[in-house]
Amino acid sequence: MSEVNKVSVSCEGFCPPPWIGQVAPFVCAVLDSQAISHWDLSIVCCTDAFIRRLNYDYRGIDSPTDVLSFENDGEYCDDAGTRFFLAGDIIISLESVRENSERFHVAAHEEFKRVLIHGILHLSGMDHQDNSPGQEMLRLQERILAQHCRVLSSGIPWES
């Protein structure tokens, strides 16, 4: 049985694509597979311009990136008295995801899942020194991706 998690998904800079409804169930499946429960987090799909501004404001880097994670670390109880951890926000540039998918010769939906998982791992407290494949966090990211490779695999318009 699935643990309780709350995931909100929104778009900034464009209308929500038809597949956007698949994102929250995918995130919940990843959280469940990692025994993470009672998280409340948000996913924002955006443009390069939007994420570039955030990257500059919060990291001093004046260029777009594929994913940013912002921890919140708060807690609250819902009306039923269930305690939730405010994990934070995962911001994903769909333009950068598409560019990455072309550069690494993978499907766009695979790269989108990869950056979602990457953001979840950052919010769970993991980090990496660089992007070399030997990094513990990146090895775990790829194992989780392989475990969930069939989820969120259809209906994404930039799939080739």
UniProtKB/Swiss-Prot annotation:
Query: Native species of this protein?
Result: Treponema pallidum (strain Nichols)
Cofactor mode of binding and number, as noted: Binds 1 zinc ion.
Output the Gene3D superfamilies linked to this UniProt entry.
Answer: Metalloproteases ('zincins'), catalytic domain
Indicate the family of this protein. Belongs to the endoribonuclease YbeY family.
Name the coenzymes or cofactors required.
Zn(2+)
SUPFAM superfamilies the UniProt entry points to: Metalloproteases ('zincins'), catalytic domain
Q: Which GO terms describe its biological process?
A: rRNA processing
UniProt name for this protein: Endoribonuclease YbeY
For this protein, the record's Pfam families field holds: YbeY (PF02130)
Cite the GO molecular-function annotations of the record: metalloendopeptidase activity; RNA endonuclease activity; zinc ion binding
* EC number(s) from the headed UniProt entry: 3.1.-.-
Question: What UniProt keywords are attached to this protein's entry?
Answer: Cytoplasm, Endonuclease, Hydrolase, Metal-binding, Nuclease, Ribosome biogenesis, rRNA processing, Zinc
InterPro entries, per database record: MetalPrtase_cat_dom_sf_prd (IPR023091), YbeY (IPR002036), YbeY_CS (IPR020549)
Q: Which PANTHER family match?
A: ENDORIBONUCLEASE YBEY, CHLOROPLASTIC
Superkingdom is Bacteria
Q: What class of enzyme is it?
A: hydrolase
> What exactly does this protein do?
Single strand-specific metallo-endoribonuclease involved in late-stage 70S ribosome quality control and in maturation of the 3' terminus of the 16S rRNA.
Gene responsible for this protein: ybeY
Q: Which GO terms describe its cellular component?
A: cytoplasm
- Major localisation: cytoplasm
Location within or outside the cell: Cytoplasm
* Residue numbers binding Zn(2+): H118, H122, H128
